[in-house]
Curated annotation (Swiss-Prot):
Location(s) in or outside the cell: Cell membrane
Task of the protein: Mnh complex is a Na(+)Li(+)/H(+) antiporter involved in Na(+) and/or Li(+) excretion and Na(+) resistance. Na(+)/H(+) antiport consumes a transmembrane electrical potential, and is thus inferred to be electrogenic. Does not transport K(+), Ca(2+) or Mg(2+).
Keyword Magnesium assigned: no
Main subcellular location: membrane
Family designation: Belongs to the CPA3 antiporters (TC 2.A.63) subunit F family.
Native source species: Alkalihalophilus pseudofirmus (strain ATCC BAA-2126 / JCM 17055 / OF4) (Bacillus pseudofirmus)
Keyword Ion transport in annotation: yes
Protein name, entry field: Na(+)/H(+) antiporter subunit F
Keywords from the UniProt entry: Antiport, Cell membrane, Hydrogen ion transport, Ion transport, Membrane, Sodium, Sodium transport, Transmembrane, Transmembrane helix, Transport
Gene Ontology CC terms: plasma membrane
Topology class, membrane: Multi-pass membrane protein
Subunit-level organization: Forms a heterooligomeric complex that consists of seven subunits: MrpA, MrpB, MrpC, MrpD, MrpE, MrpF and MrpG.
A Pfam family matched in the record: MrpF_PhaF
Transmembrane segment boundaries: 5-27, 34-53, 63-82
Length: 91
């Protein structure tokens, strides 16, 4: 029973990932694309978490940590780019 619920959750999350990916590609503004990309990262972390529960393993926990760190740094860098036009200040 629990396995079938997890499979349904994976299908719903796959649809959510697809919608976030499409929104990232065709977002009307840069801010919409950043939010969609951040949401994509969060959904991907949840998707991997459900796979970990389905396989009853902790083997992907490092992958989840790396994706979360990259998503955080990426959203901060893109937000700074929108605000100032540059990511790194040189002076």
């Amino acid at each position: 029973m629990f396995q079938s619920i997890l499979m349904i959750v994976l299908v719903v999350m796959s649809i959510s990932l697809f919608v976030c990916f499409i929104r990232t590609l065709i977002g009307p503004t840069m801010s919409d694309r950043i939010v969609a990309l951040d949401t994509f990262g969060i959904n991907l972390i949840g998707f991997i978490g459900v796979i970990m529960m389905l396989q009853e393993t902790l083997a992907y926990s490092e992958v989840v940590l790396v994706i979360s760190i990259l998503a955080f740094i990426g959203s901060i860098a893109l937000s700074k780019f929108i605000e100032r036009g540059v990511v790194f200040d040189r002076g």
